[in-house]
Amino acid sequence: MGYISTMSLKPELNILIPVFNEERTIIQVLTKLNKVCKPIVNKNIIVIDDGSSDVTPKLLEKNKKLYSKLVTSPVNKGKGSAIILGLNEVSSGYVLIQDADLEYDPNEIPRLWEIVISNDIDVLLTSRLSGSPLTRVHYFWHKLGNKSITLMFNIINNTTFTDIYSGYIIFRRKLVHTKSLKFYGWGQQAEILTYLKNRSKKVYEAPISYKGRTYEEGKKINIYAMAPVVFAIIWTRLRILFFKD
């Protein structure tokens, strides 16, 4: 009942789900989203199929009631490209990006959304490392790498984030200009967050639980992802400072 009083009002929450060969989890994710986000009246669930070659497209075709819109790419161009396609389908309200692999639990969304609308927040970044109720043990080098790039981001942007690569960010759509985005790989989240921080007045962080996958379960990130992330942080900040981007 605590959620319903405010969630029946605008603004709108647009949940973007980039998908590539997620036949094992996509219907589970969509079903769970529809269930836990039912109190959020003003919402859109937008699926972006980034050239899946398994049965994901057929599953989506058979379950149209589980989403508001389906955007398809004929070939796989990467998550960054899929996110841009999704953002281009949204013109107002807020955006949240939900991965299709269930590392991030949709049960968290109503609580996070309540925080955003109750406090009129521009950007809410979540953290797996700040008082999270339950977090699966990380790979040591992943955690060290994440802490390193978070520290660099904080120094360059004068912030105090604890986990800049947490998968859940809720932000006002108007704060991200897709034509300004130059990164399509691992660096894109750092690029987007840099723009968000520098275009926002009210930026907050909230803890979430996290169930990270193992490499056997399909985890893809590795140490080589750090280089484009570092470059994205520095390059985007320079663009903002010198080109007023």
Predicted region positions:
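A conserved acidic beta->alpha catalytic loop
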Residues: 49-58, 102
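Acceptor/aglycone-binding surface of glycosyltransferases and processive sugar-polymer synthases
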Residues: 69, 73-89, 94, 106-186, ...
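Short, well-formed alpha-helical segments that are part of the catalytic scaffolds
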Residues: 22-37
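Short beta-strand/loop segment that forms part of the nucleotide-sugar
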Residues: 34, 41-51, 71-73
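Hydrophobic helical membrane-anchoring modules
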Residues: 1-12, 156-159, 181-245
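Donor nucleotide-sugar binding loop of glycosyltransferases
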Residues: 22-25, 52, 79, 105
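Acidic donor-diphosphate engagement hotspot in glycosyltransferases and nucleotidyltransferases
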Residues: 29, 56, 83, 107-109, ...
